[in-house]
Amino acid sequence: VCGGLGGVMEEACRGAKSAGGITVGILPGVDRGYANPYVDIVIATGLGEARNVLVVKSCLSVIAIEGGYGTLSEIAFALRAGVRVVGLNTWEMNIAASTKYVDEIIRVSNAREAVDEALLGMVSRS
């Protein structure tokens, strides 16, 4: 499950397909044609960035790779929902003068480690 567009989302779908997986793209717009070519199931929401909540709520683990504010919002939604977040060169949660919020992202150094850590989270939550 991912946002279904290009870039990292497309590469995630390509990797999943090459391993025999089924891919789901939850698009921000209403035009299904914007889905990357590796998406099997297209969900065109028309929700804009609000679709990030649907992406996170559909997952047992989230892998965050680099990313902009959309990725940051997905990380925040996941942490708030108790969904395991695995990070590869992504945001760091440094909140000044706060002991309540800590960086709960599991840091990895390559894609294989990211998938392995995400799968651990799926096993523990299923």
Range-by-range predicted roles:
Residues 3-83, 91-94:
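Acidic/glycine-enriched connector segments
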Residues 57-62, 108-126:
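A charged, well-structured terminal subsegment
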